[in-house]
């Protein structure tokens, strides 16, 4: 017999049962025996601790969660569909808005896929690749700072929240200097970067690294030296290696089980195999282990950022192929709009053909050979994969993202059922889902 499930509902005509499977008489008896304490609670979608518009449907018996489900889709933006109506280069401005806390990873994954389809992945200038790694590691820092800050705030640790956002602000200032924006950068483009690092950027990053190395021990003291913080996180949101494998969980959730799986080591991209860093793991399988992993990953990211700064050499930041490359070495003109004479000369040259080519490249875009490819990068939340399909045109036929927040959120039920209602928030915070990435 299939397992039965009944939910009784009182109406003006008596009790109405909604039933799936099972024998009718047994269903009515089991529903009649249902405990008075059993209650269904909606946590979200506007609950302050649901990390955006996440809805959690909890069935609770007293203080214990007996069943937990996620309701997603409140932040659906149709980004994957929109990409099918834009050129390959314009796609960057869309993907950067998915997981809005890790924009550089979205852009990098997408651009690596497009470059692989074009067959130019070995022609990307070294300087562009190093700057990509630099920005991704700064982004890993800023994402983990938000995870730790919001996670602390939900436990009532407001100091750690203030510290987290204070340090993240320094990173956002660096983004603003380099890309002009604090988020939604569209800075990584197919073939390279939108433009080179501005004067003063390297010095500002070095200053930040120095400050951050000094500030990181504060998080250690605030959190690991705080018995209340530890008591609220230890043995909460438990998910072992078998559970992670079954659910496809990646990132800190997977590494908290002791498996050192990091795509930067297992499937290196952007030259990560040449950088010296460690993959932190824990063996606790709980929220506290994930917190410690994020803390240690921030230290490793600072190491990689320092190595990037030491490697930077002058050079181009866009491929030489004029059929693909948008103008990237731009200078700001006297009108403040980038319309400098050098810039105009570079586009127009002295021939009408050069201007026609530039016009076609920007309006129509370049063609990508018909093929499909899957590329993945290690985002702060786990494996961010992108499946890009081209039909030979100037626009993608299909772009699908494997967002780590979406996959990891499936583990919510396994982490929460059987635990306390108060621990649900801690478990969700340890996954660190961003709904922009989940719903896309």
Swiss-Prot record:
Listed transmembrane segments: none
Indicate the enzyme's highest-level EC class: translocase
- Per the record's keyword annotation, is Isomerase included, yes or no? no
This enzyme catalyses: a quinone + NADH + 5 H(+)(in) = a quinol + NAD(+) + 4 H(+)(out)
Q: Which Pfam families match?
A: Complex1_49kDa
GO molecular function list: NAD binding; NADH:ubiquinone reductase (non-electrogenic) activity; quinone binding
Major subcellular site? membrane
**Keywords assigned:** Cell membrane, Membrane, NAD, Quinone, Translocase, Transport
- Top-rank lineage group of the source organism: Bacteria
Task: State the membrane topology.
Answer: Peripheral membrane protein
Q: According to the UniProt entry, where is the signal peptide?
A: none
Tell me if Cell membrane is a UniProt keyword of this record. yes
**Which Gene Ontology cellular-component terms appear in the entry?**
plasma membrane
From the Swiss-Prot or TrEMBL record, state where the protein is found.
Answer: Cell membrane
Fetch the InterPro entries from UniProt: NADH_Q_OxRdtase_suD (IPR001135), NADH_UbQ_OxRdtase_49kDa_CS (IPR014029), NDH1_su_D/H (IPR022885), NiFe-Hase_large (IPR029014)
Q: What EC number(s) has UniProt assigned to this enzyme? A: 7.1.1.-
- Quaternary structure annotation from Swiss-Prot or TrEMBL: NDH-1 is composed of 14 different subunits. Subunits NuoB, C, D, E, F, and G constitute the peripheral sector of the complex.
| Entry-linked NCBIfam families | NuoD, PRK06075.1
What is this protein's function per UniProt?
Answer: NDH-1 shuttles electrons from NADH, via FMN and iron-sulfur (Fe-S) centers, to quinones in the respiratory chain. The immediate electron acceptor for the enzyme in this species is believed to be a menaquinone. Couples the redox reaction to proton translocation (for every two electrons transferred, four hydrogen ions are translocated across the cytoplasmic membrane), and thus conserves the redox energy in a proton gradient.
Return the PANTHER family for the record. Answer: NADH DEHYDROGENASE [UBIQUINONE] IRON-SULFUR PROTEIN 2, MITOCHONDRIAL, NADH-UBIQUINONE OXIDOREDUCTASE 49 KDA SUBUNIT
Q: What is this protein called?
A: NADH-quinone oxidoreductase subunit D 2
Natural source organism = Streptomyces coelicolor (strain ATCC BAA-471 / A3(2) / M145)
Underlying gene: nuoD2
